[in-house]
Amino acid sequence: MTITDLVLILFIAALLAYALYDQFIMPRRNGPTLLSIALLRRGRVDSVIFVGLVAILIYNNVTSHGAQMTTWLLSALALMGFYIFWIRTPRIIFKQRGFFFANVWIEYNRIKEMNLSEDGVLVMQLEQRRLLIRVRNIDDLEKIYKLLIENQYLKI
């Protein structure tokens, strides 16, 4: 096993750990889920570049009669990239005391201001950061509003 194979195994393990955390562990952290909303994906250009570069590496390894183990590891890396970038759906998960956005826990008391832009983007201003929440279904913005009002996280 070469150093290249070890690095590939490390990257595959890291992507697998991230996928498991995102799919199974994060929704169970910090209490029961009150609301889970699907978000729009950001640009897929980065993902196309990543999967394309891995495909080039697979092609190069096969044509130069490289190690079969490396080809399999590169294929596994390409599949993990495909899952994370195209199959997995980004979500915002609302809990009792806060919410997960981009895998980061944010307490409700950190929200200083909320606005809705003309194109349907919910803007939450935190102490030093601005969150741009782009929901997949525009009706989900009303669900978020109702949740925040009913639980009195948002003061009118």
From Swiss-Prot:
The keyword Translocase does not apply. It comes from the Bacteria. Coiled coil: none annotated. It is a multi-pass membrane protein. Residues 27-44, 88-156 are cytoplasmic. It is found in: Cell inner membrane. Keywords: Cell inner membrane, Cell membrane, Membrane, Transmembrane, Transmembrane helix. Residues 1-5, 66 are periplasmic. The chain crosses the membrane at residues 6-26, 45-65, 67-87. GO terms for cellular component: plasma membrane. Its main location: membrane. Belongs to the UPF0266 family. This is UPF0266 membrane protein YobD. It comes from Salmonella typhimurium (strain LT2 / SGSC1412 / ATCC 700720).
